[in-house]
Curated annotation (Swiss-Prot):
CDD domains: CGS_like (cd00614). Homotetramer; dimer of active dimers. It catalyses: L-alanine = D-alanine; L-glutamate = D-glutamate; L,L-cystathionine + H2O = L-homocysteine + pyruvate + NH4(+). The modification N6-(pyridoxal phosphate)lysine is found at K202. The lineage of its organism: Bacteria, Thermotogati, Thermotogota, Thermotogae, Thermotogales. Its EC number is 5.1.1.1, 5.1.1.3. The keyword Zinc does not apply. Pyridoxal 5'-phosphate binds at Y51, K52, R53, G81, M82, S199, A200, T201. Belongs to the trans-sulfuration enzymes family. NCBIfam families: ala_glut_racmase_Arch. This is L-alanine/L-glutamate racemase.
Length: 379
């Protein structure tokens, strides 16, 4: 099935009342016409429409599309990206287990691992985003490897297949956060990953007005996560938000191509600027990671980072406050142009004082270059 079919028509063959736009089924309950119909639905509660905390027609349509985009058998929408991360982690770990996690993973993912370590005696090894180092960290107690590639602050790329081949031989589960590349540009399932998670808050919804997460994988894993973690913890996504994600999916491929086009222009400018020490954007052909990145991804997103040639926090502050088009804000993945200086966080190590992350949006890239240029002249 090609991407156009998935985004525009898959699962929408029988829309009620011949509507061209799939409806929002904003209801808590679903009724039954007979005892047998009700009994069948209650016995097959995973996919039947019974109660909002389970499945919903609007939500289920979007889940089918997301599973198809990721080349997975099934997917589940949840209330946030962190919900997707925590549910998938909880499912594969038990007290006394060991997990390997890339040390540049999303900070709240690491905080969750630290919480599990203290509360449930789970051992966590944080290792650099390098396949060989990850494989070397495996022990006899390892049950899960948690990946992020590219990582979301320094955009480091991992040889995913090298990790999954080693994990598969040892029957270790792998989970990856695929938010940076989106399912348009990277399909980790085809590289051997067991479960793929996303913050759908970002590119998948794409308009900066939805918070959601995605978990995708094999039917068996998805069914078990749904029954064991999802139904017990209850991170339910509203059908209205699922419908907004559906709206965002219509333009996902177009938006990702534009983000990539703009990011190449901006990263080229930064790579050539005398006040910039380093640019982290793996899908630029000039990047030292391009060969590996392009073997796993067909394009890049709008997220990158760079280092200024300074170790002064004041200079970094002056730079970001001089920007006019880029706005200081966390998160990323919609049309906006955003900037986050690493030093704004209280836990910033000295070596990262000059590290700045930007998200390149959907506008004219030359305006972004002009904005960066005028701000760089101020320092």
């Amino acid at each position: 099935m090609n991407t156009d079919d998935i985004l525009f028509s898959y699962g929408e063959e029988d829309i009620p009342l011949k509507a061209l736009s799939f409806p929002i089924f904003e209801t808590t309950n679903f009724y039954f016409d007979s005892f047998d119909e009700m009994s069948k639905a209650l016995r097959n509660g995973d996919y039947e429409f019974v109660y909002k905390r389970g499945s919903n027609p609007t939500t289920r349509l979007v889940e089918k599309k997301l599973a198809a985009l990721e080349e997975c058998e099934d997917a589940r929408l949840v209330a946030s990206g962190m919900s997707a991360i925590s549910l998938s982690i909880l499912h594969f770990l038990s007290s006394g287990d060991h997990v390997v996690c890339v040390d540049e993973a999303y900070s709240w993912a690491k905080k969750f691992f630290n919480y599990l370590s203290k509360k449930f005696d789970i051992e966590v090894s944080y290792v650099p985003p390098d396949a060989e180092r990850i494989v070397e960290a495996i022990t006899k107690k390892t049950k899960l490897i948690y990946l992020e590639s590219p990582t979301s602050m320094r955009m480091k790329v991992i040889d995913i297949r090298k990790v999954t081949e080693a994990a598969g031989e040892l029957k270790i589960k792998t989970v990856i956060d695929n938010t940076w590349a989106s399912p348009i540009f990277q399909k980790p399932k085809l590289l051997g990953v067991d479960v793929v998670v996303h913050s759908a808050t970002k590119y998948i919804s794409g308009h900066g007005d939805v918070m959601a997460g995605v978990i995708a994988g094999d039917v068996e894993d998805m069914k078990n996560i749904f029954v064991d973690e999802y139904k017990n913890i209850g991170p339910v996504l509203s059908p209205i938000e699922a419908w907004l994600i559906l709206r965002g999916l219509r333009t996902l491929e177009l938006r990702m191509k534009k983000h990539y086009e703009n990011a190449l222009v901006v990263s080229d400018f930064l790579m050539d600027h005398p006040k910039v020490l380093e640019v982290n954007y793996p899908m630029n052909p000039r990047s030292p990671q391009y060969e590996l990145a392009s073997s796993q991804m067909s394009g890049g997103s709008g997220l990158m980072s760079f280092r200024l040639k300074t170790d002064s926090a004041e200079k970094v502050k002056e730079f970001v406050e001089s920007l006019r088009v880029f706005r200081m804000a966390v998160s990323w993945g919609s049309h906006e142009n955003l900037v986050v200086p690493r030093v704004a966080y209280g836990d910033c190590p000295k070596k990262d004082v000059n590290l700045i992350r930007i998200h390149v949006g959907l506008g004219d890239p030359e305006k972004l270059v002009e904005d960066l240029d005028q701000a760089l002249k101020k320092i």
